[in-house]
Structures are given as C-alpha cells and as structure tokens.
C-alpha cells in the first residue's frame, strides 16, 4: 500500500466499487443525484458514499489506524434517470457497523447528514433505503400493530373512521370535548387533536385530556362501541411528552398522538416504548414532512420517512389520500402504504420501490388518509386503501349542515355502504357514486352531506411523480 500522501484526492478511487456484491447485512440507499456540471457520474456517486460514511475532504493520517475497507460506504451502481438530463440514481451500500443499534436518529445522521449540503452536488435526494433484517431486529417498532389494535378495539372487516376536531386552534377545552363527543356518538371510531394543538394559552393540555376522556366514556356508553381520541402528547421536551402520555394512561385513554418529525425520532422512539409498556396505541402525524419530501430532486422521499417511522414506532401514520387536497400519486402512495402494512415487499420500480424489504414480522402501521376528503370519496378510499386503514374526515364531518353528529352518521353510513358493496363484489371505482346515492335514500344525514359536497374537487397535478420507465 502507498504510504501517507497529503492532498485532496478523488473519491472514486476509494468509494466507487462497481464490482462490489452487496451483503445482506448492508444498509442500501438509492440517491437521486443532480451533480454540478463537469463532475463525472462515478465521482458524484462516490462522493455521496464517502461523505455519508468514512470520507473527509482530504487525506488524513489517522486513516492508517483503521480499516477503511471494512467501514466505508460504497457506491456500487449508477444509472441515469430516464427523461432527465444529467441526473443519476446512485446506489450506496453501508456496512452495518457504521450504525448504532435501535437508533433511527443515528441512521439518518449518517446517511442524510452532511452529504446534502455538499458543493459537488446541485441536489441530492434519498429515494429509498433497504433496512437489513439484522438492523430491523434491533428496533421495537410499532407499539402494537394492526392486529393487536383491531383486537383492542374489537373492530374488524372495515377501515376505521376518524375526524380531526376543527377549528384547530381557539376552542376551549369544554367545547372541544363536546365536539369530540358528538363525532364519536354519531358513529366515528376516533377523533383527533390537530397536530398543532399541544398546550396553548386558550386550552392547556390537561384540561383538554380530561374533557376528551369524559367525551369518550359517554360516547362508549351510548353506542356500545369502543371509542378513542388521539390525545396529542407532543411537547417541548421529552420529559413533558412522557408526562402527558402518563396522564392519558391514568385517564384510561386508549390512544395518544405524536408529531414525529417536529418532535424528532429520539422523542418518538421513547414515546413508542412507553406506549408498548403501558398498552397505549400511538397515532403519528407527519407535520413537516413536505419540507423534506415534496421536491422531486432534493430531500428525502416519504417512503424513507415511512420506513423510519415503522422502525421508530407508531400504530397509525398519515400517508396522503390520493383523492383529497394533499399531495399523493396513487402508485407511489400505495407503494409506501404497503411498506407500512405488509411484512414483505418486493422491489417494484413502477411503484417507486427500489429495494425488496423484509420486515421480519415487525408489526405493521395503519396508514391514515386525511385531508380534503368527504362522503363522495368513500368508495374510492375503500377501494384504494382496503380494510387496514384509517379514513379521517375533519371538515368532511364537522362541515355537515346539520352539525357534527349527523356529519359522523353520514360518514359511517357511507363507509358501511361501500364496504357492503365491495363484499358483494361490486366495482367501487366504477359504481362509487351510485353506491353512495343508493345509501343516501335511507339516510337523511348522508343525503344532506352528498348535497353539500357534490361539487368539491381538488384537481392539481402532483409535484412529485414517478420517472418514465
């Protein structure tokens, strides 16, 4: 080997290894790389591998004290992106030794830390990660998962129904609890704190928790069904978050909520461990995700954030609607919905899945469809998301002309109609409107809802689309 030689060096000499055969313990990453002009693709791919593992910008003599070959990330494959000039997918393999066990925080600090501010790249985006079985096994994952949740709630054979309480800011705790009661009484399974309801001057968290618990018990007694309200425990410190979760448990609440990106993965994993130890379900909101995942050329795709959440832990996570007001293309969305729910997912580039992922029975996460959806969307949502999902109608419940409880009734009737039609073998995509119309004949609440929302559409092209194949 060559002795120590100072100076700046090309990354590709060390970090571009097309002959490398990936190990099943490696963490694999697919980056979409948009380089500065004049930098050859191998150098860019190698640069990403280096900066996100052992490399630094110059030769350092301490390299001689370790085995670079053992610890370095390797760019093992580069492919041009069809239809894009000068853009590549760089595949990088990281040896498992580089990562702390059971820490999503550490995994991200390594893989998407410094490298994203790197000058040689105009833009870089992490499209997908393959988490090896050996690493997955160091995580607890979701506190309970889909099957345990159904058993706890005694609800089978249909999607679950939720509603975010609006107006999201400004209600007093008692009025807030009243809205919760009306929705649950009308037929919803859950109501939800908005993600930015934490503990503000107009409604402190403890007051809200108390009135919501009262609403849950009252609605359960009247309907004979198990009800829940996602009590948002997100707080300014981890200690305060756990304090809120403890109080929720003392009230006998079935589920709490956390904003996992603004709260951070460390806090989220702590909350998930607390929830499993104490029998609480954990609803996860993805506030801030679009800052990270919306641009096609830079940032991180949501499927990576979704995988990270399954490792860190949550029983529900918001995953777009495909039909409402928020971003989500159908194939891409279904790709990461499967990554959240299923145990084994095959590589399938037509759905944006770059790697085969085996979760080795880590519990699944229920995808939550929420944002600009209403009764007319119900057949499409039932068709797209299937039974293992939570459909959330905020305005689509509370905007009902007769009030909150009738709004909840309308949604529950629409859902039961769609599930019944599906079980009879009808085509929900083609006959959706007809199914809702038929159901509205015997439900005045649904008929009124159909009238209000018959013209509402959110038609914009998605910003983040699949590459042409």
Swiss-Prot record:
RuBisCO catalyzes two reactions: the carboxylation of D-ribulose 1,5-bisphosphate, the primary event in carbon dioxide fixation, as well as the oxidative fragmentation of the pentose substrate in the photorespiration process. Both reactions occur simultaneously and in competition at the same active site. Its main location: plastid. The keyword Metal-binding applies. This is Ribulose bisphosphate carboxylase large chain. The keyword Disulfide bond applies. Mg(2+) binds at residues 192, 194-195. Belongs to the RuBisCO large chain family. Type I subfamily. The gene is rbcL. Keywords: Calvin cycle, Carbon dioxide fixation, Chloroplast, Disulfide bond, Lyase, Magnesium, Metal-binding, Methylation, Monooxygenase, Oxidoreductase, Photorespiration, Photosynthesis, Plastid. Binds 1 Mg(2+) ion per subunit.
